[in-house]
């Protein structure tokens, strides 16, 4: 069974009927009478007694801790790159030669 349809047969001659969104939705609530005069609570008032803000305090503390750790890690990474890459590539020249050092080659010749 072949379901391929050539593009010339998929023309746009079919008319699409639709309802404009402005007419489909009724946003005029001011003209309608209100059925509920009192506010509707989604959570009973008795259940809200045990609610406190500790979870947001803990999450704020975790965010601060993670940001401090990330800052320290970034600082250490930049210091390691500076120390092992940038400082090691610079050639260090000395104007004076230490002849008393035992590491000088051919000292005893």
From Swiss-Prot:
Entry keyword annotation includes Nucleus: no
Lineage of the organism: Viruses, Viruses incertae sedis, Naldaviricetes, Lefavirales, Baculoviridae
GO cellular component terms given for this protein: host cell membrane; membrane; virion component
InterPro entries (alphabetical): AcMNPV_AC78
UniProt keywords, alphabetically: Host membrane, Membrane, Transmembrane, Transmembrane helix, Virion
Pfam families, alphabetized: Orf78
Gene name tied to this protein: AC78
Recorded superkingdom: Viruses
UniProt keyword annotation of Membrane present: yes
Subcellular localization(s) per the UniProt record: Host membrane; Virion
Residue spans crossing the bilayer: 61-81
Role according to the record: Plays an essential role in budded virus production and occlusion body formation.
Membrane topology: Single-pass membrane protein
Protein name (database record): Protein AC78
